[in-house]
From Swiss-Prot:
It comes from Alkalimonas amylolytica. It holds the Pfam family CitMHS. Belongs to the NhaD Na(+)/H(+) (TC 2.A.62) antiporter family. GO terms for cellular component: plasma membrane. Keywords: Antiport, Cell inner membrane, Cell membrane, Ion transport, Membrane, Sodium, Sodium transport, Transmembrane, Transmembrane helix, Transport. InterPro entries: Cit_transptr-like_dom, NhaD-like. The gene is nhaD. It comes from the Bacteria. PANTHER family: SODIUM/PROTON ANTIPORTER 1-RELATED, SODIUM_PROTON ANTIPORTER 1-RELATED. Its main location: membrane. It is a multi-pass membrane protein. This is Na(+)/H(+) antiporter NhaD. GO terms for biological process: sodium ion transport.
Length: 483
């Protein structure tokens, strides 16, 4: 009896939700922005995102709340439309958003697999060991890790780059909290800035490229604005770096077999994706998935030739009496592509799914249209894009960029590049504003903190504004100023 009362209560609640006059039967999407179900969906998304922002405190993966929120939002939407006997409209909208996610997810999965393969082959360890052996001063280390972050992130993505450079700093300056915090702030700014002028540097730039709004070569016009965004705060912070030499640490790292060839295959994969998109007008994910095939064939080659390679190396080590090398050879395991796939950042990919589906659902309800009218018609696009860059420091740049793409505002090419820049570098204003910042707070826990980053926010903001000014000046013709 109690369960029947619960069912009756739930049915009554659903009737209340779906009985407002706005739900008139129509083949077109309904405007639900003023309905109770619309407000409930907004509340669900807000609660989910508050939980995401509290990831560090709650020790809860950020994908969990948005996955549940996405399900609840689309279930509510589905109930609305099926009550009006037009379920096909909801199904088509859901499949459209799912397809957008699937293309981006597969693209990112291949990129992450290659990065994990290069990490397993010890390419990044070798780079770190080289920097450590050189015995650079703190000043040199500050600038080298910053510039390497800026130039590696367009290829290896800003998150991977930041983690690599932070590992170098933590190894060399072990225990020096002040210097580690300064370097981590510098690395986050540099990695985010470097990722802004490449479709492979950040998820947001990849989204813009996949949407066909910016060609791959056109991202390069953001190079100088991004460089300014990095250099201004770096120059100021460098005055606070002590001019002394850390103790030299020797670390010998030997590249595993095939490391450089996998790097070559990664570059070939990127080239394949670019050619598919630019010459054949096919989604870039086709080229990336083909590139995963390159890696699988090479993995097969490595496994088939492993016994012969080990025999040659073992014979050489025995002739030289190198017991350490013989010990290492005894622990060699075959290269496995699928183990690299399994090590992809699945929490990030699932978080991305949740965000895409949540924002897609809110857009289907009509809220993105309202936001577009408020931002891009109530304001001019330049002001709107600058504001959205600042907002991305608080609520992450992925939902911000996806919302803008879903709004499809009428903007010049220069304005699309502007939102690409601001969403990419705006996250540097706070440590929680980018994946790189959040990751380093975990990797350098106790050294790099929210407030340690926050005290540099004013000078970072100056770099943010300066980069926008440089873009508006250098790329003025893209804004149709002289039309």
């Amino acid at each position: 009896m109690q369960s029947l009362r619960c069912v009756s209560w739930l049915a009554g609640l659903l009737c209340l939700l779906f009985s407002t006059p706005v739900f008139a039967a129509s083949a077109a999407p309904l405007d639900l922005t003023s309905s109770l179900v619309g407000f409930v969906c907004i509340a669900i998304f807000v609660v989910a995102y508050v939980l995401v922002m509290g990831e560090e405190k709650l020790h809860m993966r950020k994908s969990k709340p948005v996955l549940v929120a996405a399900g609840l939002i689309w279930i509510l939407i589905g109930w609305v439309y099926i009550s009006r006997d037009i379920p096909d409209v909801t199904e088509a909208a859901f499949r459209h958003n799912l397809l957008e996610f699937a293309e981006l997810m597969l693209f990112l999965l291949v990129a992450m697999t290659y990065i994990n393969a290069l990490e397993e082959r010890r390419l990044f360890d070798a780079l770190r060991a080289w920097m450590i052996r050189k015995g650079f001063s703190y000043q040199n280390l500050f600038w080298i890790t910053g510039f390497l972050s800026f130039f590696i992130s367009p290829i290896a993505d800003n998150l991977t780059t930041a983690l690599l450079m932070c590992a170098v700093v933590m190894k060399v300056a072990e225990g020096d909290k002040r210097f580690i915090n300064l370097c981590c702030v510098n690395i986050v700014i540099a990695a985010n800035a470097g990722g802004a002028f490449s479709p492979f540097g950040d998820i947001t730039t990849l989204m813009v490229w996949q949407a066909g709004l910016v060609r791959i070569d056109e991202f390069l016009v953001l190079f100088f604005p991004a460089l300014v965004n990095y250099l201004i705060p770096a120059a100021v912070m460098s005055f606070f770096v002590e001019k002394r030499q850390p103790s030299a640490v020797y670390e010998d790292v030997e590249l595993k077999r095939g490391a450089l060839r996998i790097l070559t295959l990664f570059l070939l994969t990127v080239a394949t994706a670019v050619l598919c998109h630019s010459l054949l007008h096919l989604p870039p994910v086709l080229g990336m998935m083909m590139g995963l095939g390159y890696l699988q064939f090479f993995g097969y080659f490595l496994r088939m030739t492993l016994p012969g390679s080990l025999a040659r190396k073992r014979a050489m080590a025995e002739r030289e009496g190198d017991q350490e090398k013989l010990k290492r050879l005894g622990g060699v395991v075959p290269f496995d592509v699928f183990s690299r796939v399994s090590r992809a950042e699945w929490d990030t990919l699932l978080f991305f799914y949740g965000i895409v589906m949540c924002v897609g659902g809110l857009g289907f309800l009509g809220y993105l249209g309202l936001m577009s009218d408020l931002l891009y018609e109530g304001w001019n696009p330049t002001s709107a894009n600058i504001l959205l860059g600042v907002i991305s420091a608080v609520i992450d740049n992925i939902p911000v960029m996806f919302a803008v793409l879903a709004m499809q505002p009428e903007m010049s090419h220069g304005h699309w590049l502007l939102i690409t820049l601001t969403a990419g570098v705006g996250g540097s204003l706070l440590s929680i504003g980018s994946a790189a910042g959040v990751a380093l707070m975990g990797q350098a826990r106790g050294y790099y903190t929210f407030f340690g980053h926050l005290k540099w926010a004013p000078v970072i903001f100056i770099g943010y504004i300066a980069s926008i000014a440089v873009h508006l000046w250098l790329n003025a013709d893209l804004f149709h100023i002289y039309d």
